[in-house]
């Protein structure tokens, strides 16, 4: 497990006064992957090919697409599970930093092998893996209740009946349904979940979301 890494080098910054030397997010992402993550993995007997899960924190949602271009270049095949998480601005120990990444990987010489899981469910971003299995552990990419048309239909509140139904509960139902499909494809189930991370735009939605977990896994500690 690599601790969160941010970019703090001239190579990761736009030259002063230049407007067309690239995008800041691409420079930072490239630097972190090439100059920080890859060497750290090598020192630990691992490599980018054996990364199984990454959490990527981005301070600007407009950076998601250009970041994904850099990500796809470094992980053309056998992509790790990944979660992209928007933060506040500024959101890191460097005031002008745009990105931070933490990583979990297998050692190259270890017995455990990385297996990409495909359960046929929609990913939050095109080109991402749905999940990665590594031995007895299953790492699922960050999930959204979304499909090619945006927010899933079941979670769209009828403006004529704005207080009839709960969008957050419908979103949780959709995500847990997808998660269960992934678990089954990997030979396990939601009942074996050991860690959950939920990201809310409104913490008032936490309890309604938790109630959906209770329906799926009654009386189970989460």
Q: Model segments located where?
A:
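N-terminal presequence-like segments and the immediate start of the first folded domain
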Residues: 1-53, 58-195, 200-222
